[in-house]
Each structure stands twice: as structure tokens, then as C-alpha cells.
UniProtKB/Swiss-Prot annotation:
Assembly and interaction partners: NDH is composed of at least 16 different subunits, 5 of which are encoded in the nucleus.
PANTHER family linked: NAD(P)H-QUINONE OXIDOREDUCTASE SUBUNIT I, CHLOROPLASTIC
Family assignment from sequence similarity: Belongs to the complex I 23 kDa subunit family.
Keywords in alphabetical order: 4Fe-4S, Chloroplast, Iron, Iron-sulfur, Membrane, Metal-binding, NAD, NADP, Plastid, Plastoquinone, Quinone, Repeat, Thylakoid, Translocase
Any Pfam family: Fer4
Source organism: Bahiopsis tomentosa (Tecote)
Binding-site positions, [4Fe-4S] cluster 2: C74, C104, C107, C110
UniProt name for this protein: NAD(P)H-quinone oxidoreductase subunit I, chloroplastic
Residues at which [4Fe-4S] cluster 1 binds: C64, C67, C70, C114
Cofactor: [4Fe-4S] cluster
Amino acid sequence: MFPMLTEFMNYGQQTVRAARYIGQGFMITLSHANRLPVTIQYPYEKLITSERFRGRIHFEFDKCIACEVCVRVCPIDLPVVDWKLETDIRKKRLLNYSIDFGICIFCGNCVEYCPTNCLSMTEEYELSTYDRHELNYNQIALGRLPMSIIDDYTIRTILNLPEIKT
């Protein structure tokens, strides 16, 4: 008779322990119910990127001296720099500069090590296309400045959202 009593006590303890675990999980769920949602309605609302966000690279053609430091520091040798040596002035003249963003890993080494600061990172991150060849940007496409999210009147940013009272 005593073994049956101890089994019943073990069953009761297990039931209490299971109820405690379920209660702990329920309390965690309830603690998250008061928080605001993290998701946003993406095409219509956008997050404002941080100051050091590494988005699309902006290139200033006039500042580039065709030193190819960006190619040497790139872990995948991505930037394509075409130049011609001007013999009369003994300097390189930049002919073409391009970056394929389908391959770029956005490490920022090219921007950091550029001696003339002709490269900079923008806050543009929407680079998706249906054709991967459209991701190969030449110096004209790299020279375009993106529209700032804050200046875009068609998009509600998180700063402009109405506050939800809790």
C-alpha cells in the first residue's frame, strides 16, 4: 500500500511542476503583450537608418585619382577601375569605375581606405532587381545621390507615426 501512496505523491508533484512551467510560459507571454509591435508596414513605412549604416556606395568621379586602393583592400577585388596613363602630365586619368552590388558584401573597406574620400556609404538599401546585370553600377549610377528617407514625402517614417497610448 505504501508504494501506491508514493506513486500518487510523485504524480501530484509532477502535476504541480507541470502547472508551474505552464504558468511561467504564460507569464512571459503576458509580459510581451504590453509591448508595441516591432514590425512596420514596409513599402509605406521605413525605418530611419543609423548614421554608420553601410548601404549603396556613392562615388565622386572628380575626386578619384585611380590609385586602386579600393581594389586592393576589397576582400573580393570587386571595384573595376579602368584608367589611362597620361604621358605628358605623368598621371593616371580615370576612364571608368564600376561596382557590381550583386557580389559586393558591403564591408566598407573601400570607403575607409580611400585616400581622396571619393567613396562614401549611403543609406540606400533597396537594390533588388529582376535582372542581376542591373546591379552592376558604373560611375554615372554610382554618382547619383539617393533620396533621403526623411525627405521622401510618400513614406511615413517611424518618427512621424502617431503614438499609441498604452
